[in-house]
Amino acid sequence: MDPLEASRLVTDEYSAKILVATFKKPKSAIDLSREYGIPIAACYRRIHALEHAGLIRCTERALTQKGKRISLYMSQLKNAYIFFENGRLRVRFQLATGITRDFGGDWKAVDVLEPSFPTQ
C-alpha cells in the first residue's frame, strides 16, 4: 500500500467511524451500520479493506437470536500518523500488537497532479 492509499483509508469517513467504534469493544457490521448510519454494503466494503490492511480483525463469531452467525470486529489500530514534509508524504500505523507499519518509509514522493485553473 502506498502512503496516499494508507492515508485515505484511515481518513475516510466510514472507515474512521468503524475504527473509533471498535477501538474498545468488538462490534458487528450490522451494529456499525445501524449505530453510525453507514450503509450496510459500504460498511462491509470498509471492513474488508480495513481487515486486508491489518487495521481491524474478527475477534469472535456470535449467534444472533435468529441463529445466524455474525462476525464481531475489533480495531487493531492504536495510533495513526500522517506526515507531510517538504512535499513528501509518509504514513505510520502503530498496531495494538506493538507492530509499526510505515508507508513511504524513505520519504518517497507521491505523484500528485497539478491543479489546472481555467484561464480567462
In which residue ranges do the predicted regions lie?
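Short, cationic-aromatic polyanion-contact patches
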Residues: P3-D12, S28, T59-F84
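Alpha-helical residues within the helix-turn-helix
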Residues: R34, E51-H52
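Amphipathic alpha-helical dimerization/coiled-coil segments
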Residues: L77-Q120
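N-terminal helix-turn-helix DNA-binding core of bacterial DNA-binding proteins
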Residues: D2-I38
